[in-house]
A protein has these predicted regions:
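OB-fold and OB-like single-stranded nucleic-acid-recognition modules
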Residues: 9-111
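Bacterial N-terminal signal peptides
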Residues: 1-5
């Protein structure tokens, strides 16, 4: 069990690496479908609504995508549905459900 845990940790990128890579990769929701799993991205748009648990609906005005925002990150963000936001995270592809974004940073965009 410990070996599996260490191996899984070795494959995961640290948040600071994701932030560096995403700073150079501003994309639209429609472009995400063409990206590989674990690609670091930055998105700007509107947080539409909280769906359940860590899942939120996001739109960049062109397309919609699900955001997976951990509870501790969400509580610290002071963001609510309808806010314009900038999201930094990783593309998370799945075999049997739609692609989403695993969020490592979210901040409100002031108008």
């Amino acid at each position: 069990m410990t070996t599996l845990s260490l191996a899984a940790g070795a494959w995961a990128k640290d948040d600071h690496i994701i932030l560096q890579e995403a700073a150079k990769n501003h994309v639209s929701v429609s472009a995400i479908a063409k990206l590989k799993d674990e690609t670091a991205v930055t998105l700007k748009g509107i947080l539409l609504k909280h769906l359940n648990e860590d899942n939120y609906e996001f739109s960049d005005g062109i397309g919609d995508i699900l955001l997976d925002i951990d509870d501790d990150l969400w509580k610290a963000s002071n963001i609510k549905a309808g806010d314009k936001v900038q999201v930094v995270g990783e593309v998370d592809t799945h075999r049997y459900k739609p692609t989403d974004i695993e969020v490592v940073k979210i901040e409100k965009v002031l108008k």
